[in-house]
Amino acid sequence: MLALVGLSAMAQENDTVSMQVNDSTALVEQSASVKKNVRVLSVNAEVRDHLTHDIIKGLKGVKLNAADSTFVDSIYGGYYDENGYKSSYISCAVLKPGKYLIKVEAEGYQTVYVPLDIKKLYKRETYRSLKPIYLKRMPKRNEIELDEVVVKATKLKFYMNGDTLVYNADAFNLAEGSMLNELVKKLPGVTMEKGGVINVNGKPIDTMLLNGKDFFNSDRELLLENMPAYMVKHVTSYERVPDNVKGKPEEKSAKKQLVMDVRLKKEYARGWIANAEGGGGLTFHRNEQGKHDGKFLGRLFGMRFDDHSRLVLFANANNLNDYRTPGEKGEWTPLQQSEGLRTTYKLGGNYMKEREERYHYQGSMETTYSETEDRQNSNSATFLEGGDTYGRSFNTRKSYGWDINTRHYLNLQHDEPIGDFIKGLYVYVQPSVNYRKWNHLGDNASTTLSEDVASQLGKAWMDSIMAPDAGGLLRKYAINRTRSSSKNQGHSTNTYFDSDLNFRPAHNDYIRFSLNLSHNYSDYLSKDYDHYLLDYPSSTTMPADFRNRYTPVKNREQTLNVSPGVTFSLGKKRQFDLIVSYNFNYNDQKSNNPLYLLNKLEGWDKADSHALGTLPSVDEMLSTLDADNSSNDKTTRTSHEPSIALTKTFWGHVKDKDGKEIEDESWYAYLNARFRMPCAHERMDYQRGTQVDTLMTRNTALFRMDVTGYYSLFKRGRSVNFNYSLESSAPMMTNLLNIRDDSNPLYVTLGNPHMKNTHRHSFYGQYSDKFGKTMFNANANVNIVQNAEAMGYIYNKETGVRTVTPDNVDGNWNMNAGSGIDFPLTKNDKWRVKENANYSYNHSVDLNGTNETLVATRSVVRTHNVTEDLSLTWRPTDKMEFGAGGKLTYQHSTSDREYFTNIDAFTFQYGVTGQIDLPWNMQVGTDLTMYSRRGYSEASMNTNELVWNARISKRLPKQNLTILFDGFDLLGNLSNVRRYVNAQGRTEAFYNVIPSYGLLHVIYRFNKEPKKK
C-alpha cells in the first residue's frame, strides 16, 4: 500500500504548505478507505544533510517490521522550497501499533535506519513528528570533469513558482556599483518610493528577507543600500502568515504579509563579503555665503554568512540626504527634494544563528548620530470666509540627535511529542531596548497679513519682521507678528519584552493552545526653553506680549498584555477553525507638564536680559508657575477583550475542459470572520490649576469586526482578496474635560464633554494576475468615518487667534481605485511597457468659522485626483538600455463654501533615460526630464524645470575597484522651492538645499568563498 502523506504535521502549522499536505492527507484517507473506521497516523520527519543541514532531494525509503526486517510499506520522500521555507522530509502511514524500522536513503548519502515505536493509535491524533534525521555523505569517488557547454538564451525576467513570483536578477541591466535598491526599481510590476516603500503588483510589501531570514528586523533601507546587486540571484515575492501570530489562535484570521525575499547566488551563499565606498564632491552653485557646499559619502559593509548563520558589521557616514541615482527614472521634482542639510553617522551589527531546525536566535544593535540644519522661508495664504489671510515666515533650526537600538529574539521549536503530554511546542522570546537623546535650537519670525503684499519687500522681509520697530508695510497690513528663539533637549528610553508559547496535546490534533505575554515601559524627559514675543503692528491699543517660558515634561508609561487562546479544528479534514481568545491589557500613564513664565520675575521680562536656557532659583521659578496651563495626570486603563473567529479553508486542483484535474495546477482559498468586543475601565486623576481637579472614570464597550476572503491560483499567479473592517474608538479622556489651554496665545484649545465614539468602515478589494510575461493588478478601497473627530476652529481676523474645539462631524469618506500593467511589446522582451493609473476622491468635512460668524460651521471640500504614469523601456542588447516616459497628475477641488476658489491644477513630467556599457570596462548612465506645473491661479506656481543627471563609471577588475562620478542637476534648473495647494490654502517654501552637485566616489569589493573540498 502506497501512503503519501507529505508534511501532514506541518499542515496546521504553516499555511504555505497546506496545499501539498492536504492533497497528501487525502491520498492517505483513500488508501485506508478499504476499511471503515480505520485509524491512520501520519508519521513524518525532517531529513537534512549531516554537516550543512541543507535539504536533500530524491529521498526514498521503506517501513520495515522491527522484529524481522520484513517489508511493511513504502515511504514517501519529498521536499519543499517556496515562500522562504525549505523542507525535505519523509512520511508514512501507520495503521496499527507496533515497532518498526524506517529506512531512509538518498543518492550520494549513506543509508540510515530509524526505530519507530507506536504503542497506541489515538482517535483524535492524526500526525506525529519524529526528531530530524541527518544523512552523511558517501566518500567521494574520482570524477572526470567535462568541458562546459555554453548555451545562450533570452533571460526570463520573471516567472511563477507555485504562489511565488520569482524575478531573475541577471536579466536586468544595472549601472556599475549598483546596490539592491537599483535592482528592485527595475523589476516589472514593482515600484519603490522614498523611505524604502516597495509595492509589488500594486500591493506594499510588509517584510524584506535575505535568503528567507529576517534582516535587521526588516530595516529594508539598510539592506537595499548596502547589499551589492551583483550578489543577487533571485528576488521573490509571496504572502505568508506574520511571525508574531504563528501558532496563535488568530493565525488563520490574521492578514497575511506580502514578503520580498532576496536570494543570493550560490557562490555567495557561504563565505565573506566586504564593500567599502568613499567619495566627495561640491555643489555646482554657491550658497548664501558665496561658498560651494561640500558633499561626502562613506560606507563600510562586511558580512560572514552561510545557510544557518550570519554576522554583519556596517558603518555609514554621509551628508547627501538623498536616495536617488543618476541614469534612472526618478522623482527629481522640488516636492521630492530634501528639506535641509543633514549629516548622518551610523554604526551597527547583526547576528543570526539556527541549528537542527529546533532553535533560531537573532539580534542586532545600531547607533546613529545626526546633525541637521534647516532654514525655511515661506509665503502662505489661508482660505477663509469673508477673505483670505497671508503669511510670511522665516525659520532656522539646528538639531543634534543620538540614538541606540538593540533587539534580540529566540525561537525554540519541538515538533515531536514530549512524553504523553504535548507536542508541536513553540516558544518565542523577544526583548528590545531603545535610547534616544536630542538637542534642538531654533529661531522663528513670522507675520500674518490682511493683504497679499509679500512680494513688495522681497528678501528684505526678514529684516523687516525681525526689526524691533515695525516698518510701514507691517504697520498697515500686519495682523500680528511673532519672533521667538527656542531650545529643546531631552532623552527617552523604551524597553519592550514579548513572548509566545503555543502547543498541542500529544494525542489530539484538533485543538491548539497559545499564550502571549508582553510588557512595554517608556520614560520620556524633555526641557523646553522659549523666548517668545508677539505684537500687533497695525494696532495702537493691543500691547506686545513677551514670554520667557520654561516647560520641563516628564512622561512615564507601562503596558502589560496577557492573551491566552485556543483553536478548535472542525470537520473531517479540519477545514474549519473556530478560534476563541481573550486579551487582558493594563496600561498605566503618568504625565507632568508644568509651564513656568519666567518673565513674571523682575529683570526677566526682556529677551536679552537672560540667555536662553538660564533658570532662576527654585523658589523664584515656582512662583512663576502658570497653573491654568500646567497639568498633572495619572491614567490607568484596564481592558478585557473577548474574541471569536471562524475560518473556512478550501483547496483543490484546476480542472481541464473534460473535467479532469490538472495535477500541477492547484488553487487555495479561505474565508474568515472575526468579532471582538473590547470592554475597558479607565480612571484618570487630572489637575489643571483652578480649572480642573477631578477624578474621572469611564467604562466603554466597543464592537469591532473584520471579514476577509482570499483566493489564489498558484501556477498562474492569480489572486483575489477582499476585506471589510469596522473599528470603533472612544475619544481621548482629556478632550472631554471642560478646560482651556492658551499657552500659545495664537492657538487656544478647548475641551468638549459631548464628544461621541468614532466608527470607521473600510472596504478593500484587490486582483492581480499574470498572463505569460504580462503582469496586471487592480485595487479599490472605500473608507467611511462616522462621528469623525474634527478640530473645529474660529479664526479672529483682528488678532489672528485660532480657538480650537474638538467635535464630531459626519460625512467624511474617501475612495481610491487603481490599476497597473507591465507587458512586453516583442517576444524577445526587448521592448517593455509599464503603465499605472489611479483615481481618488476625498469628501472632507471640517468645522471652521471667523469672529464674524461666532460659530464654527460645516465646511465641505470635494477633491478629485487622477494620475497616469506610462513608461517604455528598450533593451537592444545586454549592454544597452533606453527608456522614455511621462506622468500626469490632475487635481480638481470644489466646495460650496463662500469665497472658495476652485482648484484645477496639473503636474506633469516627461523625459528619457539611457545606460550604455562602453569598452575599457566603462559605463555611462543619464536621464533628462522636464517637470511642469499648470493651472494654478498664482503665476509663480506654474513652472518648468528641465533636470539632467548623469553617471560615468570605470571598473578595475584586478583591483576589485569601481570609480564613479555622479552629476546631479547638471543644468542647475532644479529649484529649492516647494509649492503646495489644497483646500485649506497654499504655501510656497524655500529651503537651504542646493540639489545641483557632483560626487566622485570609489567602491571596493571583497569576496571570499570557502575552500571546495
Residue ranges and their predicted role:
Residues 17-35, 64, 105-107, 127-170, ...:
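Short, acidic, small-residue-rich periplasmic hinge/interaction motif at the N-terminus
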Residues 164-187, 195, 200, 210-215, ...:
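Short, polar/charged loop or turn motifs at beta-strand boundaries
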Residues 60-84, 149-156:
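Short amphipathic beta-strand segments in non-cytosolic proteins
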Residues 218-221, 243-294, 308-1013:
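Primarily recognizes Gram-negative and organellar outer-membrane beta-barrels
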Residues 70, 88-89, 95, 99-118:
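A short, solvent-exposed loop/turn motif at the edges and junctions
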Residues 33-35, 44-57, 69, 155:
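Structural motif
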Residues 78-95, 197, 223:
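Short, surface-exposed beta-strand/beta-hairpin micro-motifs centered on an aromatic residue
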Residues 214-242:
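Short acidic/polar hinge/loop motifs at secondary-structure boundaries
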